[in-house]
Structure formats: C-alpha cells, structure tokens
Amino acid sequence: MAEQKLFFDDIKEGDTGPEFSHELDRTDLVKYAGASGDFNPMHTNEVAAQESGLPSVFGHGMFTAGILSKALTDFVGVGNLREYKVRFTKQTWPGETLTTKVTVQKKYEEHGEHRVDLECSVVNESGEAKISGVAIAALPTRG
C-alpha cells in the first residue's frame, strides 16, 4: 500500500489525524521486554508486581510512546517529525484499549519549512490520558 502524502496546504488548525487503537495484553509486555531489554519484573511478573503494592503488571511507558509515534508518522509521513515530546501521565494495564489522538494546533513557516504543531495523546477506553505530548512536523506543499 502506497503512503498517502499529507500536504501543508490541505490541513487546517483543529484537524485531527486518524486514530489507532490497540488492546494491551500480557503478550505485548513480554514481547516488548525482549525487544527493549527492559525486564523490570513490574511489567512481566504478576507476583512481583502485587508484592510491590500494584494490582497487576503494567505496560512499559515506551511501548505506549511507540504506539503514539507510529500514529504521528502515519499521519505526517516518515521523516517529517522535527520534535516529539511526551509526558507519561498514567500507567497502562493489560486489557485496556489504548487509542491515539493527534490534533493540529498551529500552522506556520520556520527555518524555510512549512510546519505544524501537533497535540497528541494516548487514552484508554474511559478517555483517561496515559500519555500527553506535543510534536512538530514539517510538511511538503503542493506548490
């Protein structure tokens, strides 16, 4: 499938990117631990998590940030992100459905590029924010 190109000319402030949803499960936690090398038992060992006072194992923050990164690059195109900053606001739990949100906040020109400021987040099915962030992308023009 060919990448659909987003042009600076075609978007306006307030536009939203396509949402991406993923139901977090324990397999995600184990796979991500292996891929990242983060074997903190709070992510994969139910007994260790409960002994530390948690109700269960919880998701890696960077896994959730990765879901948001994918949503951003799917929206603005690979190679167009100039900045991406996130704040981890809540833990993610197996069984939650995580959904990305991306909104265009501002359009402008800077450093010879046509840029957009984006507000982005990942929320669960109750609308509770798990990550909030901002990103800047440079987009091509039609002209």
Report the location of each language-model feature.
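Well-ordered beta-strand positions in beta-sheet-rich domains
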Residues: 21, 83-85, 132-136
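Mid-chain, well-packed structural core segment of small domains
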Residues: 74-98
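HotDog/MaoC-like acyl-thioester-processing domains
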Residues: 1-15, 93-143
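Short, loop-centered acidic/histidine patches that primarily coordinate divalent metals
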Residues: 68, 89, 103
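Short, surface-exposed, polar/charged, turn-prone segments marking secondary-structure boundaries
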Residues: 38-39, 46-51, 61, 70-71, ...
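Hot-dog-fold acyl-thioester-processing enzymes
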Residues: 2-80, 142
